[in-house]
Amino acid sequence: MFLVSKYNYFWIFLLIASLIPTIAFSISRVIAPISKGPEKFTSYECGIEPMGDAWIQFQIRYYMFALVFVIFDVETVFLYPWAMSFKQLGIPAFIEVFIFVFILIIGLIYAWRKGALEWS
């Protein structure tokens, strides 16, 4: 009789998960046409030539808004599972989450005082 250990299914899955993309990329490399013309290295927007330079500078305020958004988005991702299991985790987890939110509020106050949230 064939005995399967506890982790053999994992290793088989990992092997198959590695082989499928490798085989797909290999077949694509063999079958796909290769064109190395100058058009391959040009940039385009929605199928047409770009208007102006493709590399533009944007103002730092967009970066700061994106950074603040990501910080509070990550906060939401961490707080939601905690809120769903609040009864099981108890007071120590509440204190940890309070410290986590307090650190984020300090970061928000810092960004606010530096003027990162001003749109002018």
Curated annotation (Swiss-Prot):
Localization per record: Plastid, Chloroplast thylakoid membrane
GO cellular component terms, A-Z: chloroplast thylakoid membrane; NADH dehydrogenase complex
Assigned EC number: 7.1.1.-
Record GO biological process: photosynthesis, light reaction
InterPro entries recorded: NAD(P)H_OxRDtase_bac/plastid, NADH_UbQ/plastoQ_OxRdtase_su3, NDAH_ubi_oxred_su3_sf
Reactions catalysed: a plastoquinone + NADH + (n+1) H(+)(in) = a plastoquinol + NAD(+) + n H(+)(out); a plastoquinone + NADPH + (n+1) H(+)(in) = a plastoquinol + NADP(+) + n H(+)(out)
Record has NADP as a keyword: yes
This protein's record includes keyword Translocase: yes
Record keywords, A-Z: Chloroplast, Membrane, NAD, NADP, Plastid, Plastoquinone, Quinone, Thylakoid, Translocase, Transmembrane, Transmembrane helix, Transport
Entry's transmembrane regions: 7-27, 64-84, 89-109
Membrane topology category: Multi-pass membrane protein
GO molecular function, one term: NADH dehydrogenase (ubiquinone) activity
Gene3D superfamilies registered for this protein in UniProt: NADH:ubiquinone/plastoquinone oxidoreductase, chain 3 (1.20.58.1610)
Subunit note: NDH is composed of at least 16 different subunits, 5 of which are encoded in the nucleus.
Function of the protein: NDH shuttles electrons from NAD(P)H:plastoquinone, via FMN and iron-sulfur (Fe-S) centers, to quinones in the photosynthetic chain and possibly in a chloroplast respiratory chain. The immediate electron acceptor for the enzyme in this species is believed to be plastoquinone. Couples the redox reaction to proton translocation, and thus conserves the redox energy in a proton gradient.
Family: Belongs to the complex I subunit 3 family.
Classification via HAMAP family: NDH1_NuoA
The name this protein goes by in its record: NAD(P)H-quinone oxidoreductase subunit 3, chloroplastic
Organism: Anthoceros angustus (Hornwort)
